[in-house]
């Protein structure tokens, strides 16, 4: 009887995982120009899903008449979400890249469930593919993503986006702000977010766990963020320290054994393979090199306090 109970529990767990075709198993690797052999920015995008990525979406460049609209269809569920105004010109896209060599990919991490917005139009997939048709550079893409979410609401869970063009590569963590209805409208529309430029010569990886921790508050060349990313966390009771100590991941997607062992461990594995077992990174103006094994207790869930660096070389 005990054996049967174990088998039933295992089958239930498998069903729970496969009920979501994405199964929370995406991995991105971002390689900057100085870290690649041909001086190219590179983004890899993998998902352990048998029902996704069997196609490449193609949209030709197009000019649109004034007053044209765009139907927003949820990328995961295919549910119609609503319509938004179309722009005058859209760029040609193939898969997750457009004609200007802008690339956007993602991994989902969920985060605090109370921050989901059930009234919103723009899901994470629509943000990616609409932005690819409207932006030419990574910086433009970040702004378009933010503007779309702020205008039409963000309809998905916490996400990390990989964003790169020919010159720059960025990582962007974001999560919605929940629902607070007033006069039939959500007055918390949009999301809180941080985007960090990956230094040239470095690589970055994320795998269904928010990766940005503390970040520079006065370096717009290399770090952009929502004006309320810290104040909103204070308001919700997620953070009560000094601004300079604010940790996005800790506030909006606290790490636990499951997320570290099943998610950050994949990012660690990418670092370990690509950096030959040695992590070199900058901390407080100093260059630090340490073995990948220094984070073994972290990625096995034994010590959640010793987080990995965001970028390594």
Regions found by a protein language model. Give the residues of each.
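Bacterial N-terminal signal peptides that target proteins for export
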Residues: 1-9
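Bacterial N-terminal signal peptides
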Residues: 8-18
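N-terminal start-of-chain detector that recognizes signal peptides
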Residues: 15, 75-77, 134-135
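Boundary at the C-terminal end of the N-terminal hydrophobic targeting segment
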Residues: 19-25
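A contiguous strand-loop segment
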Residues: 25-124, 144-313
């Amino acid at each position: 009887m005990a054996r049967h109970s174990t088998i039933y529990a295992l089958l239930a767990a498998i069903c729970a995982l496969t009920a979501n075709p994405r199964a929370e198993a995406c991995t991105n690797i971002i390689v900057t120009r100085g870290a690649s052999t041909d001086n190219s920015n590179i983004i890899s995008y993998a998902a352990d899903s048998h029902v996704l990525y069997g196609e490449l979406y193609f949209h030709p460049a197009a000019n649109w008449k004034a007053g044209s609209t765009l139907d927003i269809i949820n990328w995961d569920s295919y549910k119609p979400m609503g319509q938004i105004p179309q722009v005058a010109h859209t760029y040609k896209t193939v898969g997750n890249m457009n004609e200007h060599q802008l690339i956007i990919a993602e991994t989902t991490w969920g985060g605090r469930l109370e921050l989901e917005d059930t009234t919103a139009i723009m899901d994470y997939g629509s943000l990616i593919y609409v932005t690819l048709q409207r932006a030419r550079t990574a910086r433009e893409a970040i702004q378009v993503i933010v503007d779309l979410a702020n205008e039409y609401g963000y309809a998905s869970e916490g996400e990390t986006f990989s964003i790169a063009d020919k010159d720059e590569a960025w990582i962007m963590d974001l999560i919605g702000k929940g629902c607070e209805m007033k006069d039939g409208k959500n007055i918390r529309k949009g999301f809180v977010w941080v985007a960090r430029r990956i230094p040239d010569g470095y690589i970055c990886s994320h795998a269904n766990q928010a990766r940005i921790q503390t970040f520079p508050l006065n370096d717009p060349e290399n770090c952009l963020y929502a004006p309320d990313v810290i104040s909103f966390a204070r308001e919700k009771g997620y953070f009560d320290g000094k601004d300079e100590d604010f940790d996005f991941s800790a506030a909006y997607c606290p790490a636990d054994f499951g997320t570290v062992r099943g998610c950050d461990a994949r990012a660690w594995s990418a670092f370990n393979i690509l950096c030959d077992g040695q992590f070199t990174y900058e901390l407080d103006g100093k260059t630090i090199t340490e073995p990948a094994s220094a984070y073994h207790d972290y990625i096995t869930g034994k010590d959640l306090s010793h987080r990995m660096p965001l970028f390594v070389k």
